[in-house]
């Protein structure tokens, strides 16, 4: 997942903080988790090993800064070990004591999105220590539509509706997508990423599932309209391409994608629904609204 690294950079692999090894002591599960922590089960040797590796590295390397992605526990560990940290700021209801401790104890907050997508409850104190870095970690160069279509095998004059589902969840359901494709028979529907298979789905011939691809950016550049979830990378790619966009949040911890969808709607850069339309008339309305509300100048 990393590009070529410079000579002074190294990758240190640590055990998973979330996946069991089979050596966990389930007899300790009766002890409740305090409000200041999220994922801190007792009796997990993998967690002890990971924390040991990190604290040992803190001692050896004497780091000037740690950039912490999603773990409030690791952020608090850095602070306890006298290591300054910058915490990645994500959308969601993160008003709980665990997140607040990670944010309040941080030297700064790094938001991988534009400031227009900030949540309204983030106060001045929080925003004053936040650096908004839209496009962080994503190649936002957008191929010409015709070039992108050649790469993915789509004719220049075809209407293409792209359904993009990331890797953090189970993907969209096959049945509602089939209803949507039947509603727009003149368009070619292509899905990339995960799709939940439904035995009762009656798909028409104009929908195609391509699964995981290495060039999702080409598909976005080639599309006339995009339907997707609201993960960070997905959002940045679609906004950079300034496509008509129907955004459907998936389940994530702390309602991350739902709050991201709220922010996208408030900024006027996407049409959002809480779930995929469940009927032909629902799809007709959603797609019409997506075209009508498209504001490419706002997206860029």
Language-model regions, residue ranges each:
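Short, polar loop motifs at secondary-structure junctions
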Residues: 1-3, 70-73, 114-118, 191-199
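Conserved donor-nucleotide binding/catalytic region of nucleotide-linked donor-dependent transferases
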Residues: 271, 276-299
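Conserved nucleotide-sugar donor-binding subdomain of glycosyltransferases
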Residues: 30-75
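A donor-sugar binding/catalytic signature common to diverse glycosyltransferases
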Residues: 65-70, 88, 216-259
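Alpha-helix C-terminal capping/helix-to-coil transition sites in glycosyltransferase folds
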Residues: 60-62, 105, 221-222
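Donor-nucleotide binding loops and adjacent catalytic segments primarily
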Residues: 147-225, 276-277
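Active-site-proximal region of nucleotide-activated glycan assembly enzymes
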Residues: 80-143
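Conserved nucleotide-sugar phosphate-binding/catalytic loop shared by glycosyltransferases and other
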Residues: 1-46
């Amino acid at each position: 997942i990393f590009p070529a690294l410079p000579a002074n950079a190294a990758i240190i692999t640590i055990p998973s903080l979330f996946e069991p090894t089979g050596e966990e002591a389930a007899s300790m599960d009766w002890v409740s988790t305090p409000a200041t922590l999220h994922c801190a089960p007792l009796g997990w040797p993998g967690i002890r090993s990971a924390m040991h590796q990190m604290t040992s590295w803190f001692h050896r390397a004497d780091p000037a800064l740690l950039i912490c992605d999603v773990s409030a526990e690791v952020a608090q560990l850095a602070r306890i070990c006298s290591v300054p940290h910058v915490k990645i700021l994500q959308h969601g209801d993160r008003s709980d004591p665990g997140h607040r401790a990670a944010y309040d104890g941080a030297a700064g907050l790094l938001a991988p999105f534009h400031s227009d997508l900030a949540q309204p409850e983030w106060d001045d104190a929080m925003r004053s220590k936040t650096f908004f870095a839209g496009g962080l970690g994503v190649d936002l160069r957008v191929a010409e539509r015709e070039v992108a279509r050649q790469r993915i095998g789509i004719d220049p004059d075809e209407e293409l509706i792209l359904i993009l589902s990331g890797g953090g969840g189970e993907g969209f359901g096959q049945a509602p997508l089939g209803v949507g494709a039947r509603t727009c028979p003149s368009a070619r529907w292509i899905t990339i990423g995960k799709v939940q298979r439904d035995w009762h789905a009656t798909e028409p011939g104009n929908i195609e599932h391509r699964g995981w691809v290495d060039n999702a950016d080409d598909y976005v550049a080639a599309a006339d309209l995009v339907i997707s979830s609201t993960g960070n990378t997905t959002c940045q790619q679609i906004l950079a391409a300034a496509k008509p966009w129907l955004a459907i949040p998936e389940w994530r911890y702390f309602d991350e994608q739902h709050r991201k969808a709220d922010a996208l709607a408030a900024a006027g850069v996407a049409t959002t629904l809480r779930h995929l339309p469940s009927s032909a008339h629902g799809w007709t309305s959603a797609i019409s609204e997506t075209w009508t509300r498209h504001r490419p100048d706002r997206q860029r």
